[in-house]
């Protein structure tokens, strides 16, 4: 999918992204704790190169890391900085394509690319370009953490939708329910168009918001191979039941 439509998808979602969580602050803490355990050092210089509204970046900042966030969506990156400030944290953010990161070589101890962000890139060439940039901005032996959906499992069934998530959210209409679900339209063997639906209460009625984007169902072996080709070593996958993170994580080190 062309770059503007991915940025547009997240610009449109930025104000309401937190509504996909039953308790966004609890998710921030939980995801930050899980990633912090994998980082395994104090006050690491961390780049979250797909920071969105800050779920992982803020969680890591709460753990004492020196976090920089970048995202293709200007509205998401701006909200991440604002949400960090509201929590008394400093989060420097930039609007950037992960294939062209505006940071110096070797600037970071850890690069995070979480929440199925990398599979917005739909070709091996683009994924390799992004991974090569992540490698470039990492110090030698720096840590890479990439999370995706469990595509090896999903490719077997090619689901047409996700189950609706119904949450009671305190900041919506005095605590009324919100509903979020997705429709998936598989248009070839491994790519799918996604429609993201949110139903929000509005004066006794439902306001429906729909955003659309495209993903590549990038399996673990293929992503591992692409990361190795971009200069990463010691590659392995850590599963949610082991890490406490909500998606499978590719864990790797920048080659010397």
Where are these predicted regions, by residue range?
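A short glycine-rich, Lys/Arg-flanked "PGG" loop and its adjoining helix->strand segment in the class I
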Residues: 128-140
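Class I SAM-dependent methyltransferase SAM/SAH-binding core
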Residues: 54-100
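Conserved beta-strand signature within the Rossmann-like core of class I S-adenosyl-L-methionine
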Residues: 141-148
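SAM-dependent methyltransferase
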Residues: 148-220
């Amino acid at each position: 999918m062309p770059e503007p439509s991915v940025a547009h998808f997240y610009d449109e979602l930025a104000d309401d992204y937190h509504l996909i969580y039953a308790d966004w602050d609890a998710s921030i803490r939980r995801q930050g704790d899980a990633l912090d355990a994998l980082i395994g050092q104090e006050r690491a210089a961390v780049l979250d190169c797909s920071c969105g509204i800050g779920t992982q970046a803020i969680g890591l900042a709460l753990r004492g890391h020196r976090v920089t966030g970048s995202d293709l969506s200007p509205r998401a990156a701006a909200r991440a900085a604002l949400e960090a400030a509201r929590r008394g944290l400093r989060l420097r953010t930039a609007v950037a394509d992960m294939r062209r990161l505006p940071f110096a070589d070797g600037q970071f101890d850890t690069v995070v690319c979480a929440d199925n962000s990398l599979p917005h890139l739909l070709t091996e060439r683009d994924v390799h370009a992004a991974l090569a940039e992540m490698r470039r901005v990492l110090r030698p032996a720096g840590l890479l953490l990439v999370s995706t959906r469990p595509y090896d499992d999903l490719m077997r069934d090619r689901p047409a939708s996700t189950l609706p998530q119904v949450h009671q959210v305190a900041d919506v209409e005095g605590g009324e329910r919100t509903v979020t679900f997705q429709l998936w339209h598989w248009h070839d063997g491994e790519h799918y168009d996604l429609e993201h639906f949110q139903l929000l209460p509005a004066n006794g009625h439902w306001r429906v918001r729909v955003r659309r984007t495209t993903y590549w169902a990038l399996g673990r072996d293929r992503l591992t191979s692409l990361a190795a080709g971009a200069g990463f070593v010691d590659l392995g996958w850590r599963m949610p039941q082991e890490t406490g993170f909500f998606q499978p994580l590719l864990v790797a080190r920048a080659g010397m």
